[in-house]
Amino acid sequence: FRRVLFRSQAFLAEKIFEPLNMLETSFSVEPEFHDRVAEPFARDPDGGMQMKVIDVCSAATLASGGGGLVSTASDYARFLQCMLGRGQLDDVRLLGPRTVDFMTTDHLGEIPIAPTGSRNMLPPGHGFGLGFAVRRTAGANAEPGSAGSYFWGGLAGTAFFVDPALDMFGCLMIQAPNQRDYYRALFRHLVYAALTD
């Protein structure tokens, strides 16, 4: 198991993090950088419930490309710049442009996202690509954004969006209990409200 964990970490470092100069992204934080970790609340301030999150200061036991990475705002911004560049950042081509287009295209179509009466993970007017919620049309939703924009969130309230039509992205790095949907929506509204062009 440790061999698989190491290979996953090494693969991501070699193929993604190092080429994009994301040198502060990993599955755990080295001891000399523990003082830089933004610790989430120990208790949910809304209900007082004890919160349990991943201990990023200990060695990772699972290398999941879909969850568990630790990063900085500047490293995450480099990844989002690469996505906005359709797979290229500076002189580094990480993905082909058509691959990024395919990843950020709705693949659900009319497939129901959630059973009737249950909480839907996607807002109205959105579908899902390969790892991203994708906006199908403008309107149909209170969230601002262009058709073709895509987003997702991480543990403890982190969130990002990429809006290719407006040539921009946003990244919200917070550490709080639960998903903090209100703050994610507020962040996006404030970013779009600040646009002057």
Give the ranges of each region predicted by the language model.
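Short, small/polar residue-rich loop motifs at catalytic or cofactor-binding pockets
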Residues: G154-A156
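Short, structured beta-strand/loop micro-motifs enriched in basic residues and often containing a Trp
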Residues: F151
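Short, well-ordered beta-strand elements
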Residues: A159-F161, D167-A176
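Extracellular/periplasmic catalytic domains that process cell-envelope and extracellular macromolecules
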Residues: P124-G125, V162-P164
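Short, surface-exposed loop or secondary-structure junction motifs
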Residues: R2-P144
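Short, well-ordered beta-strand micro-motif
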Residues: A133-V134, F161-D163
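Generic C-terminus detector
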Residues: M173-D197
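Residue-level recognition of short loop/turn positions
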Residues: D46, A165-L166
